[in-house]
Amino acid sequence: MSKKQNTAPTILVVEPDNDVRPLLRTNLHRQGYRVIVTLDEEDAIARARGDGDRPDLILINQYRLPLDKVVNIGRRIRQDAGLPNDTPIVIMAERYGEDMEGKDVKVGESDYVTYLEDGEQLMNLLRRLCPV
């Protein structure tokens, strides 16, 4: 990961939901992360390519899209922004059965889908993949 010496890791958040976006940003800041918040794939690629911080992790909310499409969006962001192939992608699943609740499923070399039971589960996964 591109963690800079004495600099908190940076998470690129793709969150189209206006209600969730500020909460997610605040919670990630409280955990010690630097946060780049974007609304969609195009915005995420532009921000990740920019002159500012390069993300150490990509966090995407499924938000009404099929899960496989969201995984592909994450992979395109990583590729088109020129991020390392081992940059983790975490998808927050929106729709799932009770049997999946509380699970983190690896769907690629460094790609994960998290079926959230609570916010602490997400923070634990992020700390494991991108320690502060």
How does the language model describe each region?
Residues 43, 65, 82, 94-99:
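Negatively charged, flexible loop motifs adjacent to catalytic sites
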Residues 16, 62, 91-96, 115-116:
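Conserved active-site segment of CheY-like receiver
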Residues 1-19, 54, 85, 114, ...:
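Non-catalytic signal-transmission and effector/linker regions of two-component phosphorelay proteins
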Residues 18-37:
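Two-component/phosphorelay signaling modules centered on CheY-like receiver
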Residues 26-31, 47-49, 103:
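Alpha-helical interaction/dimerization surfaces of two-component signaling modules
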Residues 59-80, 84-85:
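Conserved phosphotransfer microenvironments
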Residues 68-72, 93-114:
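Alpha4 helix (beta4-alpha4-beta5 surface) of REC/receiver domains from two-component response regulators
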Residues 39-57:
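Acidic, metal-coordinating helix/loop segments flanking the phosphotransfer/catalytic sites
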